[in-house]
Amino acid sequence: MFTVFLLVVLATTVVSFTSGRSTFRGRNAAAKASGLVSLTDRRPQCCSHPACNVDHPEICR
């Protein structure tokens, strides 16, 4: 009985760990996309500021 309990705990841990990682990747990608959209909205301010222009050359082309 104890062995079955340990197997259930292990299976639950593995499933929650792997699903948590994929969810984190999705949120991270969404956060990056959201950040790029907000930078694109501020294009004139960013492109005229040298430090921002160097950090984000993809929006100042």
Swiss-Prot record:
GO terms for molecular function: acetylcholine receptor inhibitor activity; toxin activity. Residues 1-20 form the signal peptide. Residues 48-50 are annotated as: Ser-Xaa-Pro motif, crucial for potent interaction with nAChR. PROSITE patterns: ALPHA_CONOTOXIN. It is found in: Secreted. Disulfide bonds join 46-52, 47-60. The modification 4-hydroxyproline is found at residues 44, 50. Residues 21-42 form a propeptide. GO terms for cellular component: extracellular region; host cell postsynaptic membrane. Keywords: Acetylcholine receptor inhibiting toxin, Disulfide bond, G-protein coupled receptor impairing toxin, Hydroxylation, Neurotoxin, Postsynaptic neurotoxin, Secreted, Signal, Toxin. Expressed by the venom duct. Coiled coil: none annotated. Belongs to the conotoxin A superfamily. Alpha-conotoxins act on postsynaptic membranes, they bind to the nicotinic acetylcholine receptors (nAChR) and thus inhibit them. This toxin also inhibits high voltage-activated (HVA) calcium channel currents in rat DRG neurons (8% inhibition at 1 uM toxin) probably by activating GABA(B) receptors (GABBR1 and/or GABBR2). The cysteine framework is I (CC-C-C). Alpha4/7 pattern. This is Alpha-conotoxin-like Tx1.2. It comes from Conus textile. The lineage of its organism: Eukaryota, Metazoa, Spiralia, Lophotrochozoa, Mollusca.
